[in-house]
Amino acid sequence: MEPLPRAVWLLCSWFGISFRRRKRSNLRRAVELPGKPPFFCRENRAAIEVNIETDLGKVHIINTHLGLGWRERLVQAQLFTSAEWRAAIAGDTPLILLGDFNSLRGSRPYRTLSRHLRDVRELIQATGPIRTFPTRFPVLAVDHIFVNGAVQPLSLTVHRSALARIASDHFPLMAEFALSPHRCPE
């Protein structure tokens, strides 16, 4: 993988999330997410938006890390489904929204997102929960990948390694996707 230019890498890793790429890409924006954090955790939360150029056209990717309080997460999930954010992405542009949502399936933030996007776990018909947290003994599935109709997931796995266990308290999700040539704008 090629690292992002240093200035972009510093910006993108500011709130504990990062983006690295193999293909040509451009950073659309890195934003601090809204919502009042709970008293026990005053961490800033963010989202990084990038466009990746593929042989089939542009793919829009948003990497995020939502807060710990349920009200904070709900406000943040509503941001991603707002008219402003949806209008910024062309209707047929493949979209992947991924990250640490700190939300279980069935929670209000999760339901807010799944009304507009599809959960990769459900699309590949995972036979059991794909647990990512905590790395010491993963019992919760709070990390998710959502896609729109222009993206077809092919696989979803949890990357479990000694290095992943050291790098974070969450194991990373890894997914492969297919894009429909007629749905990818140039």
PLM feature spans:
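Solvent-exposed loop/turn segments connecting transmembrane beta-strands
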Residues: L4, W70-E72, R165-A167
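Metal-dependent phosphoester-hydrolase catalytic domains
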Residues: I17, E84-I96, N102-E186
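Short, glycine/acidic-enriched loop or turn micro-motifs at the edges of active sites
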Residues: L66-L68, S103
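His/acidic metal-ligating clusters that form di-metal
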Residues: A47-T54, K58-I62, L74-L98, P109-Y110
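N-terminal, active-site-proximal structural segment of metallo-dependent hydrolase catalytic domains
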Residues: M1-E2, G57, Q78-S82, A178-E186
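Structured beta-strand-rich core segments of catalytic domains in phosphoester-bond hydrolases
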Residues: M1-K58, T157
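Conserved hydrophobic/aromatic beta-strand scaffold that supports enzyme active sites
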Residues: L10-C12, A47-N51, N63, H144-I145, ...
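Acidic-and-aromatic substrate-binding clefts and catalytic sites of carbohydrate-active enzymes
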Residues: F40, W70-R71, R136
